[in-house]
Structure formats: C-alpha cells, structure tokens
Amino acid sequence: MFKKKNKEIIVGSNNDGKIKEIKDLLPKYYIITSPKDYGLKSPKENGDTFLKNSLIKAKYFSKKTKKICIADDSGLEIDLLNNQHGIYSARWGGNKSDFNLAISRVYKKLSQVDKNWKSKNIKARFICALTIYGLKKKPIQSLGIINGRISKKKIGNKGFGYDPIFIPENKKLTFGQMSQKLKFKNDHRAKAFKKIKKFL
C-alpha cells in the first residue's frame, strides 16, 4: 500500500475547468499536478467511447511522468441531435475549444433540426468517464451519467464548457448558475468520482 500523504497525482487534462473540478474532488493529501507542469500536450483521442478515451489519456500521462494519473473524458449528448456531440463535444469549439462557439453551434443545429425546439423539452445527458492509471496493476474506471435538458438560452457564468445550457433533471438552474457545492450534488463528474474514491 502506498503512502498517501504528499503523494503526487497528475490530472490528465489540459482543460483548466476539468483540472479545477477534479482537484476539488480529490483528497487533500494529494499533491495535484497537470500535464502543463511537465510541458506535455494531450494525446490523440481516437477511442470510440468515453471510457476508451479516458484510458488513453490516463495511460499516456502516467507513462510519461511515472506518476499516478486520473483522467476524465466527458461530453454532452442531445437526443434531438442523435446524441451529438458525445465524445466529440469539445471539438465543436474548434482548435481552441471555444465553448461559446460550441454553444452557438448547438443552438444553430437545434434550430436547423426543429425551428420550434425552444417550445419543447430537449432531453440531454452529461456523461463522464474517469480512469485512474498507475495506482493498481489494472486501470480503475467509472462512468457517471446525469440526465437533464437543454436550456432555451445560455444562463450563468459559473462552471465551464456546456454548463450554462444544461439543466439537470428535476432542477430549475443550469450548471452555469450553480455553486460548486450544489453542482457536485447533481454532477456527472462527481457521480463518477464517488464510484472510485475508495481507491484513493
């Protein structure tokens, strides 16, 4: 059993929003680092599922740094768009992962499919896959799914990514309006983390 105190773990992402959320979920005795601390860029994500892409990142950064790595792959699926964007969610923001651009594209696409979409309940879900690599002989993985709907407009400036347009099931606020404490009670990433925190 490794000594947990002052143990380094690398969060396998170059997305500042993800790094912050995962850091806040991890036990406080870890020293948290990121690929930027090692001058590493993200690997090519060519998996066809969230779990596969999460594993690709966790394995890559763990091998490169010789450290334990926890990596996230997540995305938004929208029923009306045939579950797009799914694993390609971040790519809708272009090379710079501009989520303002991505959100604009979501609304444009919804209007193209159904010009009256704002009068309907557009079902969607956030999915998060987490992988811990380098802690055990085999990777540790989990999946968190939160159902909800797409808001009629962008609301809130908290969180990151698609948070301002996603309203979780049985709630009235978007993730972009929620405090971090409230979001973690309804969040796909926190849900996935709960399944693997016992290993940490």
Model features per residue range: what roles?
Residues 2-12, 16-200:
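Anionic-ligand binding patches
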